[in-house]
Amino acid sequence: MYLLSAAFWSVIRIFIAYFVSLLFGIVYGVLAAMNPRRERWMIPLLDVLQSVPILGFFPIAVSILVFLFRGQRIGLELAAIFLIFTSQVWNIAFGVYETVKTFPRDIAEMALSFGMNSNFLVKRIYVPALIPTIIYNSGVSLAVGWYFLMASEIITLGNVEIRLPGLGTAMMGYVAQGNLAGMLITVGTIVFINWCTQWFLFRPLIEWSDLFKFGAVGSAPEEPGIVAFLRNNIRWEKISQHLDRILSWGETLRKHQKILSSLRYVLYAALLGLFAYFLYWLLKPPYSPRLVEIPENLIATTFRVIVAVGLSILLSFPFVIKAIRASNTVKNIYTLAATMGSVPAVIFYPLIVRSVGREYMGVAAVLLLLTGSLWYTLFNMLKGALMIPSTIIEMANNFGVRGFLYYRTILIPAMLPSLITGTITAWGGAWNASMVAEEVNFGKEIFSIHGIGSLLLSATAQPKELLWVVLAMTLWIVFINTFFWKRWYNHAAEKYNFSE
Amino acid sequence: MALLELKEITKAYIEKGKYFSVIDEIDLVVKEGELVVIVGPSGSGKSTVVRIAAGLVSPTKGQVFYKGQPLPGPNPNASIVFQNFALIPWLTVQENIELVLEARGIPPRQRIRTALKYIDLVGLDSFEDAYPRELSGGMKQRVGFARALAVEPEILFMDEPFSSLDVLTAADLREEFLKLWTSGKLSIRSVVMVTHNIEEAILMSDRIVVLSARPSKVVGEIEVSLPRPRDTHSKEFESILDHLYALIVSSHISK
């Protein structure tokens, strides 16, 4: 009974966060892709938000929400949902943006030539065309959501620890008691819930989403029951009318250019002022002596993250090769990966750390980072492998390009853009996991290793120190992203592109 | 009277600091009742000319006039048949046609009536509920034609409409289109078609405009006044073919 209600609360949190992410991700992605002026600031912002370890910001978000709701449970619930949301949304927003950006040109021209306005275009063409991407990315997003759920249900504020009812809290309880049966049942429940969502929801939806792909051939897939149900039971006409009203309201607002632009300046000024005050507050002495430890800890964590990401790529390869050899297994691999990915490895972590002991905690930490990054490389590389034109694979078979030559000249270059996307997201995932991998609290005993995550946890009691650590980490990650990943990706996307 | 007029149209791109012109000062007049075919080598910017003429792409220099008025944006009296059909995969044949009628603000009942009428006209009756993916290339292009005709435009642009089809299907569809065009049943007053198939150009056109390779210029025009249906083996046809061929080759040599 206890587990049932715990599962109920966890599922509610995940799905609320997921629906908000879906809505936000679609709106953000479409808005960014449709207007170059917006694109210029929305995409770099998305890049930063996507790559920054959200868990690092969690203490800050919790403090704000708890303060706003005066410590009531709703504030904590919102903080938890917010954390899960931030783990799910960027993936969806990015997928949406990329899909709209790479939209078939002739379809866009067709829409223009038949006089479709942008409102009509978004509702009738973009949104349906997004369905395959959204469904595919939702699997990843939900799995990641479960990972963060565990971290979000137990909230530490300074010395106070607050627990929300849910499977994460239940698991921690069993771990503390050393109740193995309880732990197993909890994990079983999580796996079961995920298996059900994958099997009954996403599998049929993925099959159906083929209808929305440009250039697909063969008979049309059948409509799953859930789609028919949604179609018949929700008054889409009404929703669409409301949407139109909001949009036309926006249009009338835009006509008052003067008010709007002056309002914008007021907003800019306010933001600038706020930022200046923030900087002043941050830079004002005294400095905490622990700030000098930041670089050394950053490097320690970076090293572990690199190892974990490298391992993720290596471990993903066998699955990808299997998927290419027999494309009918892709759906199974996907379901398996989505289910496995949702098993929150975080909850086993204390057990593992305890059993390997203090000396090998570094190894255990890399293992945990791996569980936070492997799914990203796997999902992205699978997607990339599926997008290799079948003629290329047939050509390779026909000319007997096999073995090492095949991997070196065809498979790896062909998947390079998606491999890099996977690596970048895995890199983000591993950083995120670092926030929980470097310190384990067993009540009286604390196991801890050097790293930015443990430094961050020890700083939660002092807001200023916390901000310094979070900022240093953010800047470091953004720096590496812009000067390393981005360049590599742009190079690969240009060179290894199948379109002519 | 000129329905459509392109005056000194130039289109250029700036890439990596370099200036590339695709189209160089093209003049083109399309008279009412005329079927004009633009031919040119691949990559000569023929499709861009059509997109500029339809108001989808704005020229770098020059001006497009429709019925004597400068064209500010996509021409509401024009529609386009695309080389790769540009059908929406998740909509059925009928829904694909209804979609563009809806975009033009036509009420639901009339949408259905018009869609069915044009599905019938292109010979797709009983395929109303099929998805594009279930159709052959020729049938897909029939949907493309039905959709373009359904909005009852004054001018029809066709961007290599038969290039993605096999030879027999292309010949069939070409013939059917010419029948419709000469029957006077359509709302269309003029047609502009782009192709790289010179035989097709002579089969269909009243006038052929020959473009050079990039940056394209008009290198010549040929009036084709043979009676329809035209016989590709007739003497007159072959002499026009030779003339056209010579024109294209000379434009290559002069480069």
Question: Predicted regions span which residues?
Answer:
Chain B
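Short coil-to-helix segment of the ABC ATPase nucleotide-binding domain corresponding to the Q-loop/switch region
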Residues: 91-98
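Conserved ABC ATPase signature
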Residues: 131-135, 139
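Conserved ABC transporter NBD signature motif
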Residues: 62-74
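A short, proline-enriched helix->beta-strand linker immediately N-terminal to the Walker B motif
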Residues: 150-154
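Helix-to-loop junction immediately C-terminal to a conserved catalytic motif
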Residues: 54
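Conserved ABC ATPase "signature" region
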Residues: 98, 102, 109-127, 178-182
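The feature captures the beta-strand-to-loop junction immediately N-terminal to the Walker
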Residues: 39-41
